[in-house]
Amino acid sequence: MSGFFTNLFQWFSGLFFSKKAEISVVGLQASGKTSFVNVISSGQWSEDVVPTVAFNLRKVRKGNVTFKIWDVAGQPKFRSMWERYCHGVDAVVFVVDSTDQEKFESARFELHSLLNQPALSGVPLLVLGNKNDIDGHAPVNELIRSLELSKIQGRPVSCYSCSMKSQHNLDIVMQWLAGRSH
């Protein structure tokens, strides 16, 4: 019977003390966007991730925050959809494969093109340099330079090096995201 009252109390508290955040996860193909969503929702990383077609939507509860997460495909034919799924969100997460430095120029172009859309004015940006468990990955200062993050004005911008596979730095990423909740 005490379990019933505990559940009732948790449900009731959630009505008054819970927060929400809507997040869009974008980036070039094979950067780790879906792995990011999978790891934060289930705590599990898998090598067998099917490329996203168009988008996936997930709701994830972490502590007292419920995240509505748009995982948007990164292939060139889907990039024109990014703005639609970033409109009205509390934060944009841009995932970069930090081991594939040949794609940094393309990633920079796509990121700045997205952020120049008037509908995204002021939306906080979190850049994740994924795959830091692999030798030769670019450190944060290289990501900041290559993606020209210092040129981004009028919005909070943060950049972290992380690994979905080892879950390195995902705790601080989740703290950052929770800070965008309301």
Residue ranges and their predicted role:
Residues 1-182:
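TRAFAC-class small GTPase G-domain
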